[in-house]
Amino acid sequence: MAIKLIVGLGNPGQEYMFTRHNAGFWFVLHLAQQFNITLAPDKKFHGVTGRGQIHGHDVRLLMPLTFMNKSGQSVVPMVKFYGIDNDELLIAHDELDIPAGSIKLKTDGGHGGHNGLRDITPHIGNDFHRLRVGIGHPGHKSKVSGHVLSKAAPDEQIAIDSALSAAFDALPLLLGGDVEKARSQINGFKLPE
């Protein structure tokens, strides 16, 4: 099945826009900009939504404005309203367990401690596609909150942006339903030495 809904997880507000936790937002914002998709507030879905053509495919975009730990209040109603099957859903989110500059496409699995996913999976299950954008781990769990809610260092940001570019390059495959080729291309991305 082709992807019909791309969700970017993050926190609303200018103070959070450039924090690591908003890597999912960055992905959706880039898509909207690149493909001239207008994003507008949508009260019904507690988020910012858009719809347009991406590589010849009709795709909806969503950025929840509920704060990360309430992402399900935005994602679940949209999935249900439009009848989006889980294999037509891609959720982009930051991932502590992957170093900055790495990116992984995964289907299935638990929430892995990610509060946005934790709020979504009880309602729709966990068999949807996730674009896991590496932001690295600060080393100790007591530092996680400060890490995800702060800006990446300039070299880290360049690495994250490079990984996101690799995902953009694989979008034609993913949107066309060739998930395995897209996964191979995305998961095989390595930063230049």
UniProtKB/Swiss-Prot annotation:
Residues annotated as binding tRNA are Y16, F67, N69, N115
| Record keywords | Cytoplasm, Hydrolase, RNA-binding, tRNA-binding
So what EC number does this one have? 3.1.1.29
Per its record, the protein catalyses: an N-acyl-L-alpha-aminoacyl-tRNA + H2O = an N-acyl-L-amino acid + a tRNA + H(+)
Q: Which domain of life is it from?
A: Bacteria
Spell out the molecular function terms from Gene Ontology.
peptidyl-tRNA hydrolase activity; tRNA binding
Coarse class of the primary localization is cytoplasm
Q: Which Pfam family is one of those matched by this entry? A: Pept_tRNA_hydro
Q: Which residues form the active site?
A: H21
One Gene Ontology cellular component: cytoplasm
User: What is the uppermost EC class here?
Assistant: hydrolase
- For the keyword Isomerase, the answer is no
GO process annotations (BP): protein quality control for misfolded or incompletely synthesized proteins; rescue of stalled ribosome
Matching entries from SUPFAM superfamilies are given as: Peptidyl-tRNA hydrolase-like
**Where found in the cell?**
Cytoplasm
Positions of the record's site feature: Discriminates between blocked and unblocked aminoacyl-tRNA: N11
Query: Could you confirm whether the keyword S-adenosyl-L-methionine appears in this record?
Result: no
Coiled-coil stretches, from where to where?
Answer: none
Stored InterPro entries = Pept_tRNA_hydro, Pept_tRNA_hydro_CS, Pept_tRNA_hydro_sf
| Family, per entry | Belongs to the PTH family.
Quaternary structure, per UniProt, is: Monomer.
Its function? Hydrolyzes ribosome-free peptidyl-tRNAs (with 1 or more amino acids incorporated), which drop off the ribosome during protein synthesis, or as a result of ribosome stalling.
User: NCBIfam families from the xrefs?
Assistant: pth (TIGR00447)
- Provide the protein name: Peptidyl-tRNA hydrolase
Native source species: Psychrobacter cryohalolentis (strain ATCC BAA-1226 / DSM 17306 / VKM B-2378 / K5)
